[in-house]
């Protein structure tokens, strides 16, 4: 590898201008100016550093700890510094119990995916605010204020749909309400109602009923009213009606009819005492159905008559239709078919006037069932056909399929009358008719005006007459009679 030739060093003598500049002495008048300029720069920097030091704020140990500690720790320390030891214990206990509840639920549960309570600043702020105020009021002996602050927390968590925390503070409200003697027990009554609602949401019907009954007894003879102007006693009656109704539903599911009837009677009495006609009618309707299930149609008719009267008074056509249907069922169980059909046909008129299409379908189907069970397949086909046509107008596929099956079964039953008659006759003509039908699989028995095939039909005077029928190859004429055909 060859090296590059060395660069010749050039002397400064070849650049006289540079040499001349280096040999020129500095001007005397410029020295003070440069020195003064340098001093000026140093002086400015010292002033700037001094101002920066003045603007820097030193943090105290407490302020530094705020940034270092967790949110929960800061709130707890603040409450302890201000002397709210009970509030500190309450917050700490609530967080511990919430975490234990979360761990018990395990991964995959709804609470497991929630943000930990100690990391939710808004909730901790609300706890600190209302608990400290409640503690201060308790020290002063103002239990009404303690109750208000605890109730505010319970309602706050209720809005967040946190049932556990809302129930916890509703319990605290109840404990505080028992210490308030100046209001005649009003706060205690309200606390019972709140606990009853909370227990009902948890599905604890027995405990809920106990609180509602206590609420009712505390409000008897009182003129207390809530924010909407409703009396507490009417609210207690409504709550008891609802909880008794829920209890009776479970009893009926377990086929405890007599116990359910006793519970429904209590619901009926509560609705009547609360002067709520709609609830009274609903309780009477349920009592009627329960008596039908227990095999006592006469008592059912008594309550159903009450339901009909209330429905007419309230001009509630939907409820009136329910009453007619239930009454028809009770009369049918007594063997009074004509009266049963009359009630159902009355409801059909009401349903048509009020465009109650779904109720109309149910009634048509009910009438179809009655006639189908009694062997009047002609009438059954007529009503099931009406149900099917009405279902088509609603474009409800599930309902269409259900009514279609009912209509098909009734037509098959109707057709089987002729099939059975021809089979029993067993003569040459009858066998020929049956064979022709098996070859064509058309609805040859439904229309007596068709030629080619004849069958024997009963006349009104008990004799026999030949009915001519025709088979058809058109697939559109095929009906559900194929459901009962055998190959």
UniProtKB/Swiss-Prot annotation:
Keywords: Cell projection, Cilium, Cytoplasm, Cytoskeleton, Flagellum, Repeat, TPR repeat
GO biological process, one term: cilium movement
Segments for region (Disordered): 447-487
Transmembrane segments: none
PROSITE patterns, sorted: TPR, TPR_REGION
Gene Ontology cellular component annotations, sorted alphabetically: cytoplasm; cytoskeleton; sperm flagellum
Main subcellular location: cytoplasm
InterPro entries named in the record: Bac_ResReg_Asp_Phosphatase, TPR-like_helical_dom_sf, TPR_rpt
Subcellular location: Cytoplasm, Cytoskeleton, Flagellum axoneme
TPR repeat start-end pairs: 92-131, 136-173, 189-222, 241-274, 281-314, 321-354, 361-394
Domain comment, as recorded: The TPR repeats are required for axonemal localization and flagellar beating.
Protein's job: Axonemal protein which is implicated in axonemal and/or peri-axonemal structure assembly and regulates flagellum assembly and beating and therefore sperm motility.
Protein name: Tetratricopeptide repeat protein 29
Organism: Xenopus laevis
Lineage, highest ranks first: Eukaryota, Metazoa, Chordata, Craniata, Vertebrata
């Amino acid at each position: 590898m060859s090296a590059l030739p060395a660069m010749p060093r050039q002397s400064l003598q070849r650049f006289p201008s540079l040499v001349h500049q280096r040999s020129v002495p500095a001007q005397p008048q410029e020295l003070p100016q440069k020195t003064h300029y340098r001093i000026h720069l140093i002086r400015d920097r010292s002033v700037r550093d001094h101002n920066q030091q003045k603007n820097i704020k030193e943090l105290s140990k407490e302020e530094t700890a705020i940034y270092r500690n967790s949110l929960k720790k800061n709130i707890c320390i603040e409450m302890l510094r201000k002397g709210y030891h009970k509030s500190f214990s309450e917050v700490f206990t609530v967080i511990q119990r919430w975490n234990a509840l979360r761990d018990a639920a395990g991964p995959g549960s709804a609470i497991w995916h929630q943000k930990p309570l100690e990391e939710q600043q808004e909730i901790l702020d609300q706890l600190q605010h209302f608990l400290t105020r409640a503690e201060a009021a308790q020290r002063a002996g103002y239990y009404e204020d303690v109750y208000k602050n605890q109730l505010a927390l319970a309602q706050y968590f209720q809005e967040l749909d946190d049932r556990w925390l809302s129930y916890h503070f509703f319990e605290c409200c109840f404990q505080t309400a028992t210490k308030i003697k100046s209001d005649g027990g009003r706060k205690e009554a309200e606390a019972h109602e709140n606990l009853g609602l909370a227990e009902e949401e948890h599905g604890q019907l027995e405990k809920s009923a106990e609180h509602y009954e206590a609420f009712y007894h505390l409000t008897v003879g009182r003129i207390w009213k809530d924010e909407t102007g409703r009396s507490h006693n009417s609210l207690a009656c409504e709550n008891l009606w609802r909880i008794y109704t829920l209890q009776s539903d479970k009893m009926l599911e377990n086929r405890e009819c007599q116990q359910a009837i006793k519970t429904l009677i209590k619901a009926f009495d509560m609705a009547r005492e609360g002067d709520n006609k709609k609830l009274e009618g609903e309780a009477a309707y349920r009592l009627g159905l329960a008596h039908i299930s227990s095999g006592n149609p006469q008592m059912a008719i008594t309550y159903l008559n009450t339901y009909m009267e209330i429905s007419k008074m309230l001009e509630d056509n939907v409820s009136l239709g329910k009453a007619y249907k239930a009454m028809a069922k009770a009369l049918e169980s007594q063997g009074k078919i004509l009266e049963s059909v009359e009630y159902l046909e009355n409801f059909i008129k009401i349903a048509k006037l009020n465009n109650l299409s779904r109720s109309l379908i149910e009634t048509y189907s009910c009438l179809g069932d009655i006639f189908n069970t009694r062997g009047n397949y002609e009438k059954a086909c007529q009503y099931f056909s009406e149900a099917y046509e009405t279902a088509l107008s609603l474009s409800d596929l599930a309902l269409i399929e259900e009514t279609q099956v009912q209509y098909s079964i009734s037509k098959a039953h109707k057709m089987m009358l002729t099939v059975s008659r021809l089979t029993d006759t067993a003569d040459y003509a009858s066998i020929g008719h049956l064979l022709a039908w098996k070859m064509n699989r058309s609805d040859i028995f439904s229309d007596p005006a068709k030629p080619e095939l004849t069958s024997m039909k009963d006349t009104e005077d008990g004799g026999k007459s030949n009915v001519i029928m025709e088979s058809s190859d058109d697939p559109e004429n095929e009906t559900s009679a194929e459901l009962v055909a055998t190959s």
